[in-house]
């Protein structure tokens, strides 16, 4: 059976990444999908090869659904997680966002990182060159200390974990996306 590749957080991924993902033998796209199927439309006919799943990683139900989906689509050789660390910060001209908005956004980033990385590790066969990539969006000039701190945490987490993953014959890395799409 063909190995599955998961792209999680598709709503914040550049379209070029999604187009490239369609070259995978069994692409599975997960995230908060628009009701009007705009992502599928933008990707054209090739998007019919992919599985599309509405997954809200910020909820226990969404996390459980994703973990079940990972187990049901074995073997898994590729996981790409897009984290939107720049979703929090300032409203308008340097007016800070309310704490009740910042905390859930920061929690969503940390929970998604932990849930997806542990889930991916659990379903990937050691020694198969399976990989997980964490994509971080460009914080840009409007980056807040929280944005920068979350990005630094994700990067450091991946660096520390990648050593352990390498010992198992797996790969874990971070890619910093720059705005352009």
Task: Show the residue positions of the predicted features.
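Canonical Rossmann dinucleotide-binding motif of NAD(H)/NADP(H)-dependent dehydrogenases/reductases
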Residues: 1-37
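Structural motif
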Residues: 4-6, 78, 131
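Catalytic loop of short-chain dehydrogenase/reductase
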Residues: 9, 16, 85-168, 175-178
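Hydrophobic alpha-helical packing residues
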Residues: 20-22, 43, 161, 165
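Structural beta-sheet core signal
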Residues: 29-30, 81, 134
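A short helix-to-beta-strand connector/capping loop
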Residues: 41-53, 168-172
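Conserved mid-core segment of classical short-chain dehydrogenase/reductases
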Residues: 51-107
């Amino acid at each position: 059976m063909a190995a599955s590749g998961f792209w999680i957080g598709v709503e914040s991924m550049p379209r070029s990444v999604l187009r490239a993902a369609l070259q995978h033998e069994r692409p599975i796209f997960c995230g908060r999908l628009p009701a009007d199927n705009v992502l599928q439309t933008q990707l054209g006919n090739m998007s019919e090869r992919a599985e599309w799943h509405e997954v809200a990683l910020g909820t226990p139900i969404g996390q459980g659904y994703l973990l079940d989906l990972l187990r049901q689509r074995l073997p898994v050789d590729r996981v790409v997680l897009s984290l939107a660390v720049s979703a929090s910060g300032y409203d308008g001209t340097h007016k800070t966002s309310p704490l009740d908005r910042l905390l859930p956004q920061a929690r969503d980033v940390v929970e998604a990182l932990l849930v997806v990385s542990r889930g991916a590790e659990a379903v990937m066969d050691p020694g198969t060159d399976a990989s997980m990539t964490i994509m971080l969006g460009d914080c840009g000039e409007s980056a807040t200390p929280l944005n920068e701190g979350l990005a630094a945490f994700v990067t450091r987490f991946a660096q520390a974990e990648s050593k352990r993953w390498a010992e198992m014959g797996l790969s874990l890395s971070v890619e910093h996306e720059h705005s352009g799409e």
